[in-house]
Amino acid sequence: MARLTVITTGGTISTTAGPDGVLRPTHCGATLIAGLDMDSDIEVVDLMALDSSKLTPADWDRIGAAVQEAFRGGADGVVITHGTDTLEETALWLDLTYAGSRPVVLTGAMLSADAPGADGPANLRDALAVAADPAARDLGVLVSFGGRVLQPLGLHKVANPDLCGFAGESLGFTSGGVRLTRTKTRPYLGDLGAAVAPRVDIVAVYPGSDAVAMDACVAAGARAVVLEALGSGNAGAAVIEGVRRHCRDGSDPVVIAVSTRVAGARVGAGYGPGHDLVEAGAVMVPRLPPSQARVLLMAALAANSPVADVIDRWG
């Protein structure tokens, strides 16, 4: 019988509607696992009860520390219940900083615990099954959601009526038992602290945008800025000039990385503005959404790794 630890952090999976109709975390871990009828020895750690929009990088460290404590206590696998708003960031940070062999599986819900057809119990049951499965060993951090097992790298939240929750690279399925059908990339960068990682900001690009927001981020201490660019990685002349100032002309160059506001799109320098961004000193992040490009840059800078090499390998 597998020994598993469930670490709760809040999120929709733990929420119910109050008298005012507002959803807030109310369910503890013991309530979440009640009635799941799992053939495992399950310990619960109620770490937080937060909407994931309130989480900070310091909370990623708290979650990572709780995972390590569970493994020191003899857990064979860990499941983390998490809000879907920022699950893609937490999952990637953990994957970038966890080198262990025992599985860490994140899950959550699209519907509150008191909603008709709530998806939380099934998602949690599936995540526990993945964490207990010998095939998940040595895969590091996984996401189990909506009947699928997903790789954290490249994951992004989507709104679908089938409650799948996320788009990303599928590693397998959980319907009718756990089936892992693909190998997984483990983008480990080191045992890093998110709370002390260099500041990385995200700046939106839009018609008529200029470099004011980028300048403000750099003035506030950002070591890197992710541009949420247009299309396949494009921006106007004022933004390109701002990139040149910060990457080429300054005495203390800043990393400017280019992602896109188009969900699931690949970024490249195929169009004139994208080509000009690269010539100005920006680096393209071909596959990651802005949220995850930021996390990857935080980890790369914290590890003192060459950013271009890290992006070329995992971005």
Curated annotation (Swiss-Prot):
Key word Secreted present in the record?
yes
Reported EC number(s) for this entry are 3.5.1.1
Class of enzymatic activity (EC top level):
hydrolase
Q: Name one GO cellular component term.
A: extracellular region
Q: Which UniProt keywords apply?
A: Hydrolase, Secreted
Summarize where substrate binds, as residue positions: 52-53, 84-85
The portions of this protein that span the membrane are none
Q: Which reaction does it catalyse?
A: L-asparagine + H2O = L-aspartate + NH4(+)
SMART domains the record matches: Asparaginase
Q: Please list the GO biological process terms of this entry.
A: asparagine metabolic process
Recorded GO molecular functions are:
asparaginase activity
Principal location: secreted
List, alphabetically, the InterPro entries matched. Answer: AsnASE_II, Asp/glu_Ase-like_sf, Asparaginase/glutaminase-like, Asparaginase/glutaminase_AS1, Asparaginase/glutaminase_AS2, Asparaginase_C, L-asparaginase_C, L-asparaginase_N
* Documented activity regulation: Activity in enhanced in the presence of K(+) and Mn(2+) and reduced by about 40% in the presence of Cu(2+).
Q: State the function annotated in the UniProt record.
A: Has a dual function in both nitrogen assimilation and in protection against acid stress during infection through asparagine hydrolysis and NH4(+) release. Catalyzes asparagine hydrolysis. Cannot use glutamine. Required for intracellular survival inside macrophages during host colonization. Mediates phagosome acidification arrest and resistance to acid stress through the formation of acid-neutralizing NH4(+) ions. In addition, may induce stress to primary immune cells and compromise the host immune response.
Q: Which family does it belong to?
A: Belongs to the asparaginase 1 family.
Query: What name is this protein filed under?
Result: L-asparaginase
**Per the UniProt entry, what species is this protein from, by scientific name?**
Mycobacterium tuberculosis (strain ATCC 25618 / H37Rv)
